[in-house]
C-alpha cells in the first residue's frame, strides 16, 4: 500500500461523533506511551499524529482518512495510572462500542512494547478482543531499543505469553528504523484489498 494522502478527519469523543463508515478501516490500540502515534506517523511517512511525552494524551478516537478511501483509527491508550476511574469507564464504553458496532473494522493492531514482557493490561486486551470476536494482530513496538543479542529471547517471550490465547501473528516494528513498517502496510493492503 502506498499512502498518497492522509488527513485527520474526525476526533470522536462519543459514538455519535464517528464519521460514516467507508470501504474499510483498521484500528490501533495499545498501552499509553507504547508508541501508537509514532507508529502511525511511520506508516503515513509524515508527522500527522500528535506525539506526546505525556502518557494518556489520546482521549478520543481519532479517524485518519487515507487515500480518500480508508480509515486508520487511533484508539485511546490504556493502562495509564493517572486517569480517573470515571475516565477509564468512559474509555471502555467508547472503545467497546467502536469494536462491536463498527462493521467496516477489518483488523485491530494491538501495539505492545517489545522491550518488556507483555503487561497484564495487554493480556486483558487480548482476552477482551477475543470475547468480542474482534480480529487482531500483535505489533511489537520500539524494537530498535532491543539489542540484537536479545531479540530472539524477547520475541519468544511474547510468543509464549500470547500463545495461551491462541496463535497470532506478531510483527516486530520500529518507528525509528522503519523495521516492520512495510510488512504492516502489506498486511493492511491485503485486508483492505487495495492494489
Curated annotation (Swiss-Prot):
<dbReference type="InterPro" id="IPR006073">
    <property type="entry name" value="GTP-bd"/>
</dbReference>
<feature type="binding site">
    <location>
        <begin position="74"/>
        <end position="77"/>
    </location>
    <ligand>
        <name>GTP</name>
    </ligand>
</feature>
<dbReference type="InterPro" id="IPR030393">
    <property type="entry name" value="G_ENGB_dom"/>
</dbReference>
<keyword id="KW-0342">GTP-binding</keyword>
<feature type="binding site">
    <location>
        <position position="37"/>
    </location>
    <ligand>
        <name>Mg(2+)</name>
    </ligand>
</feature>
<comment type="function">
    <text>Necessary for normal cell division and for the maintenance of normal septation.</text>
</comment>
<dbReference type="InterPro" id="IPR019987">
    <property type="entry name" value="GTP-bd_ribosome_bio_YsxC"/>
</dbReference>
<feature type="binding site">
    <location>
        <position position="58"/>
    </location>
    <ligand>
        <name>Mg(2+)</name>
    </ligand>
</feature>
<feature type="binding site">
    <location>
        <begin position="56"/>
        <end position="60"/>
    </location>
    <ligand>
        <name>GTP</name>
    </ligand>
</feature>
<keyword id="KW-0479">Metal-binding</keyword>
<dbReference type="GO" id="GO:0000917">
    <property type="term" value="P:division septum assembly"/>
</dbReference>
<dbReference type="GO" id="GO:0005829">
    <property type="term" value="C:cytosol"/>
</dbReference>
<dbReference type="GO" id="GO:0046872">
    <property type="term" value="F:metal ion binding"/>
</dbReference>
<feature type="domain" description="EngB-type G">
    <location>
        <begin position="22"/>
        <end position="194"/>
    </location>
</feature>
<comment type="similarity">
    <text>Belongs to the TRAFAC class TrmE-Era-EngA-EngB-Septin-like GTPase superfamily. EngB GTPase family.</text>
</comment>
<feature type="binding site">
    <location>
        <begin position="30"/>
        <end position="37"/>
    </location>
    <ligand>
        <name>GTP</name>
    </ligand>
</feature>
<feature type="binding site">
    <location>
        <begin position="173"/>
        <end position="175"/>
    </location>
    <ligand>
        <name>GTP</name>
    </ligand>
</feature>
<keyword id="KW-0131">Cell cycle</keyword>
<keyword id="KW-0132">Cell division</keyword>
<feature type="binding site">
    <location>
        <begin position="141"/>
        <end position="144"/>
    </location>
    <ligand>
        <name>GTP</name>
    </ligand>
</feature>
<keyword id="KW-0460">Magnesium</keyword>
<dbReference type="Pfam" id="PF01926">
    <property type="entry name" value="MMR_HSR1"/>
</dbReference>
<dbReference type="InterPro" id="IPR005225">
    <property type="entry name" value="Small_GTP-bd"/>
</dbReference>
<keyword id="KW-0547">Nucleotide-binding</keyword>
<dbReference type="GO" id="GO:0005525">
    <property type="term" value="F:GTP binding"/>
</dbReference>
<keyword id="KW-0717">Septation</keyword>
<protein>
    <recommendedName>
        <fullName>Probable GTP-binding protein EngB</fullName>
    </recommendedName>
</protein>
<dbReference type="InterPro" id="IPR027417">
    <property type="entry name" value="P-loop_NTPase"/>
</dbReference>
Amino acid at each position: 500500500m502506498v499512502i498518497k494522502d492522509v488527513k485527520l478527519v474526525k476526533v470522536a469523543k462519543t459514538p455519535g461523533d464517528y464519521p460514516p463508515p467507508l470501504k474499510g478501516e483498521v484500528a490501533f490500540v495499545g498501552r499509553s506511551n507504547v508508541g501508537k502515534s509514532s507508529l502511525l506517523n511511520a506508516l503515513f511517512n509524515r508527522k500527522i499524529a500528535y506525539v506526546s511525552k505525556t502518557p494518556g494524551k489520546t482521549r478520543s478516537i481519532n479517524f485518519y482518512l487515507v487515500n480518500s478511501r480508508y480509515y486508520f483509527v487511533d484508539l485511546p491508550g490504556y493502562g495509564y495510572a493517572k486517569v480517573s476511574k470515571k475516565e477509564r469507564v468512559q474509555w471502555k464504553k467508547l472503545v467497546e462500542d467502536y469494536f462491536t458496532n463498527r462493521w467496516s473494522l477489518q483488523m485491530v493492531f494491538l501495539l505492545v512494547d517489545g522491550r518488556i514482557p507483555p503487561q497484564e493490561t495487554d493480556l486483558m486486551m487480548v482476552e477482551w478482543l477475543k470475547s468480542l470476536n474482534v480480529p487482531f494482530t500483535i505489533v511489537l513496538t520500539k524494537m530498535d531499543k532491543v539489542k540484537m543479542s536479545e531479540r530472539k529471547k524477547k520475541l519468544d517471550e511474547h510468543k509464549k505469553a500470547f500463545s495461551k490465547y491462541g496463535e497470532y501473528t506478531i510483527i516486530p516494528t520500529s518507528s525509528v528504523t522503519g523495521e516492520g513498517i512495510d510488512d504492516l502496510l502489506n498486511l493492511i493492503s491485503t485486508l483492505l484489498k487495495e492494489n
